[in-house]
Design a protein with these regions (language model features):
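Hydrophobic/aromatic-rich core segments of domains that either
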Residues: 69-141
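Low-complexity, Gly/Ser/Thr/Pro-rich intrinsically disordered linker/tail segments
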Residues: 129-260
Length: 261
């Protein structure tokens, strides 16, 4: 038994070392994205919640994990790469259908803390794409759909490094949505994900965006299906060859379950 434990620890350490080596020479921001993308590409949420899924052995050796194991994995990788990283834990809320506490991370970049929830982003990514709805959020944004904290963590007050803002995927005008989506259709890309920052994402605004996207798609003989993360005002415009029964569907980042058809 002791020999088996020792072998397991050696294999785990070897895995961590290999991952850390691949990030050598990266800037802190690149390291954070590298860790996030590793989770989103290699870890599946364990709906059975096996014991090892709560520890780093789940994500790093079994390729599965729950939020606790994922947050611990993000932390150990960030620690080894020289990035300051903490784990945040929120309360459960049984009355709202949230049966368990939830864990995610805070990462420090240039003396400023940001929220990073790789579990939630992982629950949104489909057909090989990666989502960044929970990458470098400030307190105002993260607590739109995260429960109050079990214990205090540093304040996150900077919203300017939110992934979609920093990568010019945060749009404020309907004409910008039209222009970007037409470019996606021209390039025959399968989808376009963006953050809406042009005021409240009301039903009226959403219907206007749907109209713009549908018209642009029809011109190319295509259809569009829109998935909306209302909490973070992020939407995905997916190009399809067939008309969906439900053009607009709600998607909610959570513990590995995607809602909507």
């Amino acid at each position: 038994e002791k020999k088996k434990i020792k072998e397991m620890k050696t294999a785990l350490e070897s895995r961590i070392s290999r991952l850390v080596r691949q990030a050598e020479g990266m800037a802190p921001e690149e390291k954070e994205k590298y860790v996030h993308d590793f989770i989103c590409s290699n870890v599946t949420y364990d709906k059975l919640k096996k014991q090892y899924s709560h520890e780093i052995i789940g994500p790093l050796q079994q390729g599965i994990g729950v939020c606790e194991g994922i947050a611990k994995t993000v932390k150990i990788l960030c620690d080894r790469m020289g990035l300051e990283c903490l784990i945040a834990i929120s309360e459960s809320a049984p009355d709202r259908g949230i049966r368990y506490r939830h864990a995610w991370n805070l990462v420090k970049l240039k003396n400023t803390w940001y929220h990073l929830d790789a579990t939630f982003d992982n629950s949104l990514g489909r057909y090989g794409q990666k989502r960044f709805d929970y990458f470098n959020l400030d307190d105002r944004m993260i607590f739109k759909d995260h429960q109050p904290l079990v214990y205090k963590v540093p304040a996150c007050t900077d919203g300017a490094r939110f992934y979609y803002r920093e990568n010019r995927l945060s749009l404020t005008k309907l004409e910008d949505v039209a222009g970007r989506f037409k470019a996606v259709l021209r390039k025959k890309q399968p989808y376009y994900v963006f953050h809406w920052r042009g005021g409240y994402l009301t039903r009226e605004v959403l219907e206007q965006i749907a109209g713009i996207a549908s018209e642009a798609a029809r011109e190319k003989g295509k259809y569009v299906k829109i998935s909306v993360n209302y909490s973070q005002s992020v939407m995905e415009l997916a190009v399809t060859d067939y008309q969906s029964a439900q053009e607009i569907c709600r998607e909610e980042a959570n513990e590995g379950e995607l809602t909507g058809d």
